Amino acid sequence: MKFSEQWLRGWVSPQVSRDELVARLSMAGLEVDSVTLAAGVFSGVVVGEVLSTEQHPDADKLRVCQVSNGSETFQVVCGAPNVRPGLKIPFAMIGAELPGDFKIKKAKLRGVESNGMLCSAAELQAGEGNDGLMELAADAPVGQDIRVYLSLDDASIEVDLTPNRGDCLSVAGLAREVGALYAAEVTRPQVAAVSAVHDEVRPVEVLAPAACPRYLGRVIRNVDLSRPTPLWMVERLRRSDVRSIDAAVDITNYVMLELGQPLHAFDLAEINGGIRVRMAEEGEKLVLLDGQEVSLRADTLVIADHQRALAIAGVMGGEHSGVTAGTRDIFLESAFFDTISVAGKARSYGLHTDASHRYERGVDWQLAREAMERATGLLLEITGGEAGPVIEVVSEQHLPSIAPVTLRASRVEQMLGLVIENAEIERLLKGLGLAVTAEADGQWRVEVPSHRFDISLEVDLIEELARLYGYNRLPVRYPQARLAPQAKAEASGDLPELRRLLVARGYQEAITYSFIDPKWFELFSPGAKPLLLANPISNDMAAMRASLWPGLVKALQHNLNRQQDRVRMFESGLRFVGQLDGLKQEPMLAGVVCGSRLPEGWAQGRDAVDFFDVKADVEAVLGFAGALGEFTFTPGQHPALHPGQTARIERDGREVGFLGAIHPELSKTLGLDRPVFVFELVLAEVSTGRLPKFHELSRFPEVRRDLALLADRDVSASAVLDVIRENAGEWLTDLRLFDVYQGKGIDPHRKSLAVGLTWQHPSRTLNDDEVNATTLAILTSLEERLNATLRK
């Protein structure tokens, strides 16, 4: 909402500066976006009158004018196409300073002396018209300072209103707010009823009373739309960012800005029969005032005559029924359209108008009569004409009704944290036009006026009190609570620490959307039922993710498309899994790896990352909380992963994650031309560990045995290591697999595993007999349980 400060001060004028007024409005929730001066900075410009003009002797497009400033006559050379005798214009005399630090001096133009300058609106930065002189009213006082005459010491204030404050989309609404804020008197213009001088009416039928509970119409004959709109009205419209069109349209716009009631004027000659307010017929055509032809839907309310639609109700009129310079008789409409019926209709047709903006937010349903009389009076004053009687159709049962609200002083104190005197509460609320009746000490019955659609609960009234009292005046009270450090389990790892661990291993953290494309959901979780959003941001963000992989792989694609050949990313976030008893939101930690094992450098090659490189990163994460031994990697199957390079990660038999390469078919579908490895872990399992225990360091030598074992190809290395641990005794300090071989010299159905075992006794030196006996027990158990033998 943009308005003139002087226009507002004509209604209510607290004794405060512009800056203070703007700050107070913003603090009251009516946020001021901008303040723009009504004109540029200039001086020495007065109202001048062109007495005569003659052709310049040496220039076809220049005229030599005699201009009066009320006391003297000056010769001025002017090239404006609209200069003519009798015209009153802004006259910049010698010594005047125009915007841009442009000083007016005596000059010669093509040999003819010029003593001043006749100005356009653009040259004064008082409008956009640059195609001719700014034409002033015929009764403009010659010689008066133009800033005084046009009230240019003004500013346009633009307020960014929230959707619930449709009552402030007018000067009347803003004046009501300012009056309540400053306890200042609001002077509302007296609108007198216009007496009918003829009895012509057009019958009105409201066939959709729920959508249009109130409709008023009036015939005004013999208007003269060739008469110009008064300059004072044009200026107020300009400062409200509304362009002047013709007197009828300007007046309806002016009343809408002044009172908040949209109006529309139809050319009476284009109305066949009477007015019908009805729902459109499916596919019905209408050419709008902007020249756009629309195909109407059956849920759209229209204003029609007995033959065709004339306008989309509350949005825009039709071209064929709009007023023109040749219009002699008009039908003036003032109506209340239901908010729900109008909401969204303009956008659905690609439109947004001042009228639809107001109706969508709510218009005072008791305002239509006053607006009709106000517009009629202005029309008769400016364009002449004869007014007929007002015809009104009302469906009382469909008009809005707001129940009274009970307000308690105790609740006000509880929510705002301060005591406001009862008399002050009543004053503040009455200033907004609310009817307040005391029911008991500290309790009131509040009748909500028709212009406030956003007040229905006690908390709404308390919000109004806070706004008017001043948010900046509310006392600051800190929470009264005993603060204590939050306990943290020692045997756990924090997510920030896990993040730092992965960053130290060369990963970068990514943050992706929790919403993904349903097609991607199907790619990574085929057969699973996605959780679809009722109102998604877009079609490709319509499903909740059941895994963090889709977002990470999409981020990987983004990087690969930008020549980033080595990518290592991780993300922590929620996955969403539907269950019979509701929605499960589970924190996860996931990663994606692609490209070379090490960054490019002179000291290392460009070997590609493989499964075991990523497994090492996962083991570092699993071991962070000190419980790596509780996790096992077993061959697994996942629809999104390579069937031969997939590990299922378990802890005490529970699945806690997966690790593997993206399935070749999925890689092909996604356009990935190189191996991509991913992992995903349940964050709660990763974060829970075991408190480490101190063991005294042994001073005695270690004993190591390396075993080369032959095992069937389908026997996992972890199974071999588990059997070794079970039989190696309590003094085993280290066990590691350091080689796997398949090929020449080995049965094609077998593989060779090389493991290293290290023992160390805490209090003595182990002898060979003890170690050999333990080694023999290990080999015997391996052969019996896994058919694994010592390689010879």
From Swiss-Prot:
SUPFAM superfamilies named in the record: Anticodon-binding domain of PheRS, Class II aaRS and biotin synthetases, Nucleic acid-binding proteins, PheT/TilS domain, Putative DNA-binding domain
Disulfide bond residue pairs: none
InterPro entries: aa-tRNA-synth_II/BPL/LPL (IPR045864), B3/B4_tRNA-bd (IPR005146), DNA-bd_dom_put_sf (IPR009061), Fdx_antiC-bd (IPR005121), Fdx_antiC-bd_sf (IPR036690), NA-bd_OB-fold (IPR012340), Phe-tRNA-ligase_IIc_bsu (IPR045060), Phe-tRNA-ligase_IIc_bsu_bact (IPR004532)
Catalytic activity: tRNA(Phe) + L-phenylalanine + ATP = L-phenylalanyl-tRNA(Phe) + AMP + diphosphate + H(+)
Example GO biological process: phenylalanyl-tRNA aminoacylation
Cofactor(s) required for function per UniProt: Mg(2+)
Positions annotated to bind Mg(2+): D454, D460, E463, E464
Domain B5: 400-476
This protein's UniProt keywords: Aminoacyl-tRNA synthetase, ATP-binding, Cytoplasm, Ligase, Magnesium, Metal-binding, Nucleotide-binding, Protein biosynthesis, RNA-binding, tRNA-binding
Similarity comment: family membership: Belongs to the phenylalanyl-tRNA synthetase beta subunit family. Type 1 subfamily.
Oligomeric form and interacting partners: Tetramer of two alpha and two beta subunits.
Protein name (database record): Phenylalanine--tRNA ligase beta subunit
Gene coding for it: pheT
